[in-house]
Amino acid sequence: MRTTLTGTASVLDTTLTRLIDDVIENGSSFLADDENLQHYKQHLSHLETASKIALLRECLCVRPPLPLLPEDLLQNVDSILTRVRQHKILTPIFSLSPSRLIKHGDLGATRIHLWRGDITTLTGVTAITNAANSQGLGCFQPTHRCIDNIIHAEAGPRLREECFQRMQARGKELEPGEVLVTEGHALFASSVMHTVGPQLKRGASPTETERRQLAKCYESILEALELLPSDEDGSKSIALCCISTGLFAFPADEAAEIAVSTVTSWLQKHPSTTITDVIFNTFTQSDTEFYSKLLGPSHTKSISPVENTPQGSLSLAREWLSSADAVLVTAGAGLSAAEGLDYHSRDLFKRNFPGCLKFGLTSLYSVFGFNDWPSEEHRWGYFFTHLNMVANWSNTPTYQILIPWLRNFGQDAFVRTSNADGLFLANGWPKEQLSTPQGSYGYLQCLNNCRVDAVVPSAPLVADAMPHIDKATQKLMDPSKIPLCRFCGSKMSICVRAGSWFNQAPYQEGEAQWKAWKSRVLREKKNLVILELGVGMNTPGVLRWPNEDLVMRSDGRVKLIRVGMGPEAMVPWEQEDEGLSTCVQGDIGRAIPLLLE
């Protein structure tokens, strides 16, 4: 069932149609296939809101600054970006606790902070930094997950237009260490400091010249900030990203040392500075660890949700949850990632599976579909290590908040998850109120699926095998510990939906419990709220689309709250306009306390 487009939902489709025509007319080295673009244009009504936002950003990313976009189209984009950002969890600068103070005698002090998060969601900050390229126009490759892309996507096309005008006025490219200052446009920060750091070859050690160039970036940023007016409250602050450490390949640990020492030295040499706050902003866990060693750990003060987040979607979601008769939690990979069990994390894989790096594997996700194991001993060395790691995963603060809250609903709460990690059970949620349609690490199965009962519990086999796994190579050294089907003797694997061989038998009881629970709740006409956590687009037919369908077929008695990172967290705007769905965009680990406590 589809509803009529209203408000910003209609504006989004109209804007996308015009942008697609613009990209086709003006050409693009990246979105060069006109047929694909025409296909998108003809089928916009069938795309999810999340997909439309992603397509909008791609079109704007690849678009050259000339010809200038018409003002009415820019205003449409502004309204779309405004709606998107109303759903974000924000971090006010006043919620940060300083790691250190740089005192200036009787003139006060500059607070130094360390904060990990999305730099575009920091509020109350005068300026943020952008690790730019020498052209100063942003990144034109939408697949690059660089901060240049992120900042331009959030600021909107007016930022590229201003960058172009300022670069034209300069008449030359930016050199390493130079800074270009622009307005923030659709960003929360009033200004952006675009700087170009030194670019190294991957794996190379920086030269003394490159070290000086990186230091110059931070000096130039502080000098440019000094020239800006203070904010209304008298503060003047800058959020500093990790310059040159991504695609520019500057070693992250050395870059952190240069950043901290340069900023500290500059502030000490300028006791009359008007800069009140400097925030070292990190995005990865490894970068955070480097800065923590230099500055001390980061802290965020405990402040009320009203102060900490936008009023719109978060307040509405809290209201729905507080008045719900029943709650269905549907959880995807984003919930596990929020607890540190991130299947895309290179740091996690390198730390826990060093013996598997030589096979070209870089993350837990990269193992999906991997069949080039040298032997079964290597394959099961990995699987047993993986299962043991997950079974002993103890850092689950989100579950520690979520599950006690869910228990308040008694039999009117249910959990349905595509995660196989078993963390709901491990944190005390009853199996009678749990459905895992994609399988579970709790069982191993015959790869031939020779019989319905060709499954075995995994925990005893893991415990028996772990003493025989070489800690360096992570190879299973005792071949007798390799599990084989007790019926046909064939290979076995974890019992998850990874191929046509998947044995669903161990999970049929959970599916029956889910169907019975849903039928009862709907029959009793309870006000049901679906709290969807970290469900993306990898397998939308399992949780995401059924949730939306249930909302549309409920005559207003079922509402959906979608929580997650990035555009995938968006709900259909048509449903949102009807007051049936909303979303909270941000880290689930931060969202759950704000929603439930």
From Swiss-Prot:
Q: InterPro entries annotated for this entry? A: DHS-like_NAD/FAD-binding_dom, Macro_dom, Macro_dom-like, Sirtuin_cat_small_dom_sf, Ssirtuin_cat_dom
Annotated Zn(2+) 2 binding sites: C446, C450, C485, C488
Binding site residues for Zn(2+) 1: C139, H144, C146
Return one GO MF term: metal ion binding
Keyword NAD listed? The answer is yes
Q: Which residues bind ADP-D-ribose?
A: D118, I119, N133, C146, I147, D148, S244, T245, G246, F248
- Annotated Macro domain ranges read 99-299
Write down how the cofactor binds this protein.
Binds 2 Zn(2+) ions per subunit.
Q: What is its EC number?
A: 3.2.1.-, 2.4.2.-
Its cofactor is: Zn(2+)
The residues the record assigns to binding NAD(+) are: A333, S418, N419, A420, D421, Q438, V584
Q: Any idea where the Deacetylase sirtuin-type domain is?
A: 307-597
Q: Which reaction does it catalyse?
A: 5-O-(ADP-D-ribosyl)-L-glutamyl-[protein] + H2O = L-glutamyl-[protein] + ADP-D-ribose + H(+)
Recorded hits in Pfam families, A to Z, give: Macro
Keyword line: Glycosidase, Glycosyltransferase, Hydrolase, Metal-binding, NAD, Nucleotidyltransferase, Transferase, Zinc
Oligomeric form and interacting partners: Monomer.
Query: In UniProt terms, what function does this protein have?
Result: Is probably a bifunctional enzyme with ADP-ribosyltransferase and ADP-ribosylhydrolase activities. In vitro, can act as an ADP-ribosylhydrolase that hydrolyzes ADP-ribosyl-glutamate bonds. It can remove the ADP-ribosyl modification from the human mono-ADP-ribosylated PARP1 E988Q mutant, which is primarily modified on glutamate site with only minor aspartate contribution. It cannot hydrolyze the ADP-ribosyl-arpartate bond in ribosylated S.pyogenes GcvH-L.
Q: Which family does it belong to?
A: In the N-terminal section; belongs to the MacroD-type family. Zn-Macro subfamily. In the C-terminal section; belongs to the sirtuin family. Class M subfamily.
Name of the protein in its database record: Probable bifunctional ADP-ribose hydrolase/ADP-ribosyltransferase
Gene name for this UniProt entry = mfs1
